Structures are given as C-alpha cells and as structure tokens.
C-alpha cells in the first residue's frame, strides 16, 4: 500500500487509546528507531505506525508526511546535540576568562556526539539516526547541512582566539578536519580497526577514546 494516505484519513486524529501528545511522541520515537536501523527508504508509514502501535493516519495528522517527520527528528536531535556542545564551550570559556585553550574547545565539539554514541547510552539511536540522515536524508536536510553553520561559527571564533598566529583560513581547514574525526569515529567501526591492529586497539571506554581523539586533534591544530 502507498504511503500516500487519503485526504479523509489525513484529517482524522486517531486518538483511540492515546491522547494526541502521546500518539505524536510514540510516532516520533518509533520513526527514529526504524530510520536509524533500516534507513529512510526502507521504512514505510505503515512500518512506523505499526511499531508505534497507533493508527495509520497518525504520521500525516501529526507531521504532514514521512519526509516532514524525518526532518522534524533531524531538526530536534541536531538541535539538542548542538546545544550540549554550546553549553560545554560556554563552560570552558567561563573557566578561562573567555579564552579557553584549543583542547577544551575541541572537547566541547567532540564529547557530546561521542558520549551519545556509547553503546550503553540510550541516546545512541539518535546518533545512528543523525548519521543516516546525513547520508540518506531529504533535500531539505541536505540544504541544512550545507548552509546552516551557525553552531560551528562559535567554535571557529573560539579557535581563532586560541590560535592568534594561525591564518583564519588555516583555522577553518583544521576545524573541518576535526569534524571528520567526529564523523568517522563511531563504536560500530572499531571491530575493523581491532582486526587491522591484531587486537591492539579494542576500545569500549568513551573517556579513553575521547582522550585519544583530543591528543591527535590538539597536536594537529597546533602543528
């Protein structure tokens, strides 16, 4: 059956057994899990509502469409992640009279997504969703990824202040390379590294992994 529901179905709020807020939350959580595990194209509206245990019309009623639901999850989760980063950066600035060192700036950038990705963290599914959305998302998501850099501007400014001898161009390039570290260091990929190293690199400790990443990134930034 197509994901396009009829106008009449769209107009009906399927409230049996659920109040509207609970239904919307159930749809959101189910969609996030399924998109994270299967990918966007492999999940239908019927899959989402079955997982959530709600009426088929719920997705369109509360979010408008599957695409709009995907964007809402992406917007909310990236917003939460970037607010956590901003909070850590602000705290680092407070500790250092407005001029935190490179390592603490990078820690504010790295630590939130790394901690979310910990297999023991309930937030892990949100990171998995964000990763999927970055590679499989809609044109609207791709547009945000390309053009919404406001959350990175504060890091660039802090790094320029911490490295006054570096040309601004170099600061931006080095920040770009540091973002690559974040995007490519996920627990799911460590089995490959462990195989490559003959068992020397097994890492399940977020704190230890964060320290390794910061050692590398700080040295690169200050080189």
Annotated model-derived regions:
Residues 20, 24, 28-32:
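Short, leucine-enriched amphipathic alpha-helices that occur as contiguous helical runs
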Residues 1-10, 149-223:
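C-terminal peripheral helix-coil segments that are non-catalytic and often amphipathic
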Residues 68, 77-92:
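Conserved phosphoryl-transfer catalytic core
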Residues 104, 125, 137-163:
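Amphipathic alpha-helical packing segments from all-alpha helical-bundle domains
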Residues 2, 26, 34-68, 72-76:
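Helix-turn-helix
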Residues 86-123, 175:
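Hydrophobic alpha-helical connector segments
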Residues 109-113, 127-134, 178, 182, ...:
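Short alpha-helical scaffolding segments that buttress acidic/His motifs in well-ordered protein cores
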Residues 73, 101, 105, 109, ...:
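Residue-level detector of well-ordered alpha-helical segments, enriched
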